[in-house]
Amino acid sequence: MPDNASAQQPGQPAQGPNEHYHQPLNQPRALRIGVAGPVGTGKSSILATLCRELAGELSMAVVTNDIYTDEDARFLRSAGVLPTERIRAVETGACPHTAIRDDVSANLDAVEDLEEAYGPLDLVLIESGGDNLTATFSPALADAQLFSIDVAGGGDVARKGGPGITGADLLVINKTDLAPHVEVDVTAMVADAERARDGLPVLALSKHDPESIARLADWVRAVLVRHRSGTHVPTDPGPMAPHSHSHDGS
Amino acid sequence: MALLAPYLLADGRLPVGAHTYSAGLEPAVAAGLTRAQIPALLRARLHTTVVTEAAATALALRAALRAPVDFAPVQEALAARTPTAPLREASAALGRGVHRLARRLDPDHPAVTALARIRPRPLRPVTLGALGAVLGVGEEELVHGVVYDELQTIASAALKLLPGDPLDSVAWIVAAEADAARTVTEALAVRTPAELPARTPPLTEQWALEHDRRERRLFLA
Ligand SMILES: Nc1nc2c(ncn2[C@@H]2O[C@H](COP(=O)(O)OP(=O)(O)O)[C@@H](O)[C@H]2O)c(=O)[nH]1
Ligand SMILES: [Mg+2]
């Protein structure tokens, strides 16, 4: 672990049977941001975008969870936005929801391995492999999470809610460039989402809109500042929508 | 004797990463195993790999209860009897989840601190021995848990890999009772790491190696 030499105490042997990676005391471990949302809403693309935007200033790594283990990881490796060995896929036993909530062991192992191999890291992005609106990250794994829905899913999705939509640290309404083609009013969709989220942030994003990408990267930078200063408190959107938001029906 | 611990150890919901493991079923299915052959696979594993794993777990528990705790002999004996690298890696990955749980429950327990000294990482039976010591489980109960967990792991993974009536899975396990009892007796009779039986069926090894190179898999091994 040559990268971690600075973490060693003076006089401590660099190699030994009990060598563990220790984060330098003055620096918290990497910020872990989860990216959740239904299949096809652009999670992998968001990861690629964030790597492209931030890898120059931050030391980053990626963990993917997929139903079939390595699809997302292969997509991200081929995107060339991060050294391939910093992108790990975990097996989820066909239970990607379990792997990010009820039993996060495999993901924790992957994050710890990445920190050990390339640490100290600033940011680890974790993509969920869920296939519906209810999969969100446990705070045991992710310090913060963004939830992605897209305009192609229809303007009603934001209003219908669900734990990710109502409680994620950031809600991304993705692929806004497609809105005219699917007859969705982005402004109304954002307003609906904001109402469902009690003041939590909503970001209209398109990979073809650099200004929206800059806002996404700024959100990550802001969370990182809070994480480092110890003022960020991980919150759990929960596995279920809060009852107080269920009055809209469906 | 612990009341709840044996049930915790046998519960597939124990959050130690076991849901990512098919106990060899996914590699076997890829090699052509059919649903009708699952009961035979259960029996085959009970008479081979499970004897080794269960015996190693009992040895590890005994080591965990001695002072000072030294897991090296059982870890090395088990690694030597697990010649396929992907199977050692899978065992170490599963052991890591068990280790994390043991650390959460009793970080200063001598068996838990002894785990941290093992390199490469402790294999699952070694970590289960330590967890058994932390939970105050007897070796018979611990071995029952290992044997049951193997059956349940395969039966549950079958729901993903060769789907059918979930009630069938229960019936397969019940039908394996006599074989499971033999496995327990054999495993508990092993007294020293040197006596640990080397039960590594060549097909299990070959399938594990093939699985390791496969893309789009669901399970670790
Ligand atoms: N038009 C448009 N397409 C996008 C955008 N973001 C992602 N996509 C496309 O949406 C599809 C699914 O994206 P992906 O990132 O794989 O989604 P995931 O399944 O949530 O990881 C791909 O074909 C992407 O190219 C966007 O901002 N605009
Ligand atoms: Mg994806």
UniProtKB/Swiss-Prot annotation, chain A:
The lineage of its organism: Bacteria, Bacillati, Actinomycetota, Actinomycetes, Kitasatosporales. The keyword Cytoplasm applies. PANTHER family: UREASE ACCESSORY PROTEIN G. GO terms for biological process: urea catabolic process. GO terms for molecular function: GTP binding; GTPase activity; nickel cation binding. Facilitates the functional incorporation of the urease nickel metallocenter. This process requires GTP hydrolysis, probably effectuated by UreG. Residues 7-17 have a biased composition (Low complexity). It comes from Streptomyces griseus subsp. griseus (strain JCM 4626 / CBS 651.72 / NBRC 13350 / KCC S-0626 / ISP 5235). It is found in: Cytoplasm. Belongs to the SIMIBI class G3E GTPase family. UreG subfamily. Homodimer. UreD, UreF and UreG form a complex that acts as a GTP-hydrolysis-dependent molecular chaperone, activating the urease apoprotein by helping to assemble the nickel containing metallocenter of UreC. The UreE protein probably delivers the nickel. Residues 1-24, 230-250 are annotated as: Disordered. Keywords: Chaperone, Cytoplasm, GTP-binding, Nickel insertion, Nucleotide-binding. This is Urease accessory protein UreG 3. GO terms for cellular component: cytoplasm. Pfam families: cobW. GTP binds at residues 37-44.
